[in-house]
Amino acid sequence: MENKELRERMLSGKMYNDLSVELVQRREQAVFLTNDYNSTYGKPKEVREALLRKLLRCIGSSVHFEPNFRCEFGFNISIGNNFFANFDCIMLDGNLITIGDNVLLGP
């Protein structure tokens, strides 16, 4: 199954191969990038933002996750401006997750 068809099936709610090579690789990439992001706590904002831009579909300005942030893929997550997530945020993005502007997310 082509990558485009696989993602279309995911987003439409149809059955798809969750263990396809692409999805396994994207999960691994998400693990590495979230680990990197979580380990940069206290580093310059630009360093942390660059990691989020590699991981997530789209982010606005002033986006912050307290450690430990986790997601399944990252490519289905869009976040607006002025976002804060408290510790241990987990986003399972087998489908689109869209968060608007001026959002505080906490336990």
Residue spans for each PLM region:
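A structural motif detector for beta-strand N-caps
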Residues: S61-C71, I77, N81-C89, I97, ...
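Terminal amphipathic alpha-helical/low-complexity segments used for targeting or macromolecular assembly
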Residues: M1-S62
